[in-house]
């Protein structure tokens, strides 16, 4: 592995650890109290040891798996395999023709789309990290202006 790839992996893992989402959870998740049947439960609960020490390790493992999958797809495309490209948000695919068909429920793409439900989400608050990573990649001449 050359030094540029090693630095890119190091920056990716550093960003994963810095952007850990454990603080964004806002307390303990899941059903609490009587919703879990807490009234008839035993007072002492044995908790199994966690498989990983923190969510950062899971996120780093997921990022590494995603990068490996992307590298496999890129290698397959470079080898000349004929993969079908997924339709973007503004493009119509083969499955979208039933919306205007007679007997359909008449709902358009914007009603049940991912973008319609998540467009109100605000920024995550990690704005300082993007210029830092962009500057590091620009210094390595890996990011084209």
Curated annotation (Swiss-Prot):
Glycosylated residues in this chain: 105
Listed GO biological process terms: protein import into nucleus
Location in the cell: Cell membrane
Tissue specificity statement from the Swiss-Prot or TrEMBL entry: Mainly expressed in brain.
PTM note: N-glycosylated.
Lipid sites, type GPI-anchor amidated serine: 119
Protein name as it appears in the record: Shadow of prion protein
Gene that this sequence comes from: SPRN
